[in-house]
Amino acid sequence: MHRKFATAIGVGAGALLALSACSSSSSTTSTAPATSAAASASATASASAAATASSGGASSIVGSSSFNDAALQQLTTKIQGAIGSKSLSGVKIAFVTNGNSAYWNEAKAGWNAAMKWLSGKGASGTFQEPTASEASVQVSLLETDSAQGYTGWGVSAVTASSLTTPIAQAVAKGLSVVAYDSPLPGTAAQLYIGTPNTTAGCDAGKAMTQAIGSGEVVAISGSWTAANTQQRVAGFEQCAGSGIKVVQKINDNQDVATAVSDLQASLQANSSIKGIYAVYSYDGGAAGQAVTSANDIGKVTIVSDDGEQNTINDVKSGVIAASILQRPYYQGFMTAYVLAADKALGDSATMALVKPYFVAGPGNTLSTGVGIMTKANESDFASFWSGIGISAQ
């Protein structure tokens, strides 16, 4: 489900088509773009059409674009009300990614939208994208930010274990820490803001089952030690059923070229492969390229995670059957609000506001929801991205 790094593939395996996005009005207040009635109607129609489609094949996968936007906007309103007329001049917060990737553009849009309201009340914040996806870089940033008077720190950990002690030390000094994108259970992080990864993996498993029924599947990810990968694949295997067997787990070490070549080798070595579950954000495009070069379009079904441009292109062309999407916008948006509230209101008051919105999951999970992009409902996602000024995740 993850995003990440390395080189871009250039173009998707399918034809590069221009995204058709509906225009949406922007607001001067710190709110997320509202889902239009047309988009909602389109999502309903897409789901209805898919539900009535004949069993088997990509057309049988039911898409969804609802996420958890309404609940998170309700929570935002409550936080704003609780802050009220309080000054946020003592708030200094950071959003630290796990590397430099186009995936974070959507999260940055959400962070910036939240900071418009928060900075108007005196808060300051920085969006920090390390050029290297290394645990040591994140540890160094945490130590530096803590020493420079930051009051709150949001992080997508490269390696959870490497941050356990540094987070504990920072929290002991008064820093608030929130995990997003990948949970940090067992650490001093207060909560996790993001997709319930097991649920997202379950949706991927269901989609694969709807498309192929049964058969051998390859799973590929950039890291098999990352909590989000482990949870996604566990959810996939739980919900795919006994008829689908993951026969190979490929580690591409967050390198696109490696992902493509390893998948090509896997397809060449095993003609029985019927599906690929592509976990990291670039893996969908890599899988599309591998399947296309093997002339296996229609024979090998791809279910991917996230919505990088290459993935979108391949969903639109039918090379990828479905992609399971997160809502990075709200990872950035809610991280800013929760960290600011924790400083302004205190931990107990902030958690009292947030706790009713937790869902089942590790580390106090504030869910940003799960979306399922198919060829039938891709325009719903394009409309949202257009409204926040980007073309893809």
What are these model-predicted stretches?
Residues 41-89, 240, 338-393:
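Hinge/cleft segment of the Venus flytrap/periplasmic-binding protein
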Residues 155-172, 236, 253-314:
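Hydrophobic alpha-helical
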Residues 135-150, 259-272:
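Short, well-structured alpha-helical segments in soluble
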Residues 152, 161-199, 308-316, 320-321:
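Flexible loop/hinge segments that line or gate small-molecule binding clefts
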Residues 1-20:
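Sec-dependent bacterial lipoprotein signal peptides
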Residues 93, 97-101, 111, 202-249, ...:
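An alpha-beta-alpha
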Residues 5, 19-32:
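Bacterial lipoprotein signal-peptidase II cleavage site
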